[in-house]
Amino acid sequence: MAISPEEILHIAYEELVEIEPMTSIPELRLLERTYPPLMPLDIARIPLYAALLLKKSNMCKIRLPSYLQLESLKMSMDVEIEKADEYSCIHPYFFPLATELLENCYNVESIEESKMIVEKIKEIRLAKTLKGIKCLDGKALNMNNITLFEFNEIKELILGSAEVGRRIEDLAKDQ
């Protein structure tokens, strides 16, 4: 059974993020665990979905994760460019969460520049995938460090290419 993009997003929203309470927050009883009461100036790690609800209620500010800091994004893009034939290691929910976090965290240096770099990283990684699919021989495709989100986007293309390769191989054997 395949996992849908919506299911990936729901899983990604379970990711823990740091928040800074702006007011006293009572104990949070969530499905996975209970978080103790929080006071202003505390820093806590809670699931993104809860952080977004608290932010919407003006109860906290969400801190930008280090992997989305502008310098980190630039370094990730440089590594992707340098490693032309392999994927660099990025956060597993980098793509589904990047825009949401960039738009909701208070300590973003440059939202537009950061979004542009995230999009560029996505394009570079997609180009690597398409290059790999062109070389697909029907047996294997090595895709180390690809995220679940990326795989879900291109799986039909990969599976279709692999199936065509297998059929051609079977036809060649029959003759």
Swiss-Prot record:
Entry keyword Amino-acid biosynthesis: no
Keyword tags: DNA replication, Nucleus
Record flagged with keyword Nucleus: yes
InterPro entries given in the database record: GINS_A, GINS_bundle-like_dom_sf, GINS_Psf2, PSF2_N
Coiled-coil ranges from the UniProt annotation: none
Domain of life: Eukaryota
Main subcellular localisation: nucleus
Listed GO CC annotations: GINS complex
Cellular localization per UniProt: Nucleus
Gene Ontology biological process: DNA replication; double-strand break repair via break-induced replication
One Pfam family in the UniProt entry: PSF2_N
Oligomeric form and interacting partners: Component of the GINS complex which is a heterotetramer of SLD5, PSF1, PSF2 and PSF3.
Family recorded in the similarity comment: Belongs to the GINS2/PSF2 family.
PANTHER family found in the cross-reference section: DNA REPLICATION COMPLEX GINS PROTEIN PSF2
Role: The GINS complex plays an essential role in the initiation of DNA replication.
Name of the protein this chain belongs to: Probable DNA replication complex GINS protein PSF2
Organism per entry: Encephalitozoon cuniculi (strain GB-M1)
